[in-house]
């Protein structure tokens, strides 16, 4: 019990730049039934009676926030995005998914968040995940996923959010096997180290290839198989990438 409480406290550690929620979806009410409203945030928050005040972004009910469109509203009538600056609410935008006529071309709040200068350690992108990225993040645990893209297209961020999703949706299975994030070097790990904790996940270990492969087990020099091995690897993983059908948009 003590270990569980300590873990929960670590998950709820306050982030001065963080916010309790960043979005809301109003479901399309039917008949005389009132429409359900869900606030979407980084972590689940309940009232004393156990009713949800904020729904975790990884919960199934949150999926329409990222994927609903005018043509496929997924039962959502209105999607709301909140704007924050240093933890203070600065505004919000409502997007109707059921009103006639063309929808809004873009969200000023969404664009401002995406274009916010990236300084210091990597931040999570949970408020700005795009539909094609969400498909990757929520893909099944039994599927191998390879994310390709040019520099700056969000490959690392999508991979970390997928890790957070798997820890949430398959916690028991992942906890038994453990989860490790392997980076190219220590500087890279320092750059990404705050992303998973910001999403409430503190159990994943982070390491480098050099830390998990003993020095005496590494050999330097040309590959005796030469270009043939590289071509074979490219064909194998190229096929796996095509099989997944996932890409991060440029």
Spans of features found by a protein language model:
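Extended, charged low-complexity regulatory segments
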Residues: 1-135
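Phosphate-binding P-loop
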Residues: 128, 135-145, 171-172
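Hydrophobic anchor at the beta1->P-loop junction of P-loop NTPases
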Residues: 147-149
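Walker A (P-loop) phosphate-binding loop of P-loop NTPases
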Residues: 152
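Conserved lysine of the Walker
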Residues: 155-156
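Post-Walker A alpha-helix
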Residues: 159-160
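Alpha-helical nucleic-acid-binding subdomain
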Residues: 167-250
